[in-house]
């Protein structure tokens, strides 16, 4: 079987290095490009050695100079916007794992997906996407409770994370609201806010240390509570999911796909 050729955008970052390390030992993949910011101090370094693995003879570059079968982006919104346009112009499938995109950037993603295959998900984790499926099921059952259900989402990430709440937390809320019908999304509480209305979802973001990601979704009823918690113990879960998504995207036609499509959920 011929390996799928991939490029990693954001290759010198924390996630990019794990993508390089894990992608380099996957017999179904071949890393042919590793791209980072043109101002990165790691330009020219071997991507494999930078990631702490074997030499790959693939230098960190400031631009995409080859034609891979798929690109994986783990960067920041403005850089993701640039690689999106490059993939669009070259007709290259894209796995978009960057979070924190604004509405205009999201609109560009939807438009580009009419021309190229894009796997776009706030989390590449298998268990996170399974938890989303469980939350949709729970919401469909619990919304019938006469006493009402209070939904709160608590997410924890490392101190370096720039967007809050996480894109994954917002996706959990979007899924639950789509099933249960909540209209208000409240971010934290402070002061005399009054009694809690049942038509809202509360979000609470915690930033500590090097936590790679944790989400707890609370369904509170009278007399009982259901909590669904998913925890990442390291970043490999996101990298492995993104690598699987690249294999998937390389075989698809134009369209906007999610990790649910990759996992068959």
Language-model features: locations:
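Rossmann-fold NAD(P)-binding glycine/threonine-rich loop
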Residues: 83-85, 89-90, 98-120, 129-137
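N-terminal Rossmann-like NAD(P) cofactor-binding module of classical short-chain dehydrogenase/reductase
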Residues: 71-72
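C-terminal substrate-binding/catalytic lobe of Rossmann-fold NAD(P)-dependent oxidoreductases
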Residues: 5-65, 147-265
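Rossmann-fold dehydrogenase core element
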Residues: 93, 108-125, 142, 146, ...
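Short glycine-/small-residue-rich Rossmann-like dinucleotide-binding loops
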Residues: 75-76, 99, 207
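Residue-level detector of alpha-helix initiation sites
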Residues: 13-14, 78, 125
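Rossmann-like NAD(P)H-binding beta-loop-alpha module
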Residues: 130-146, 164
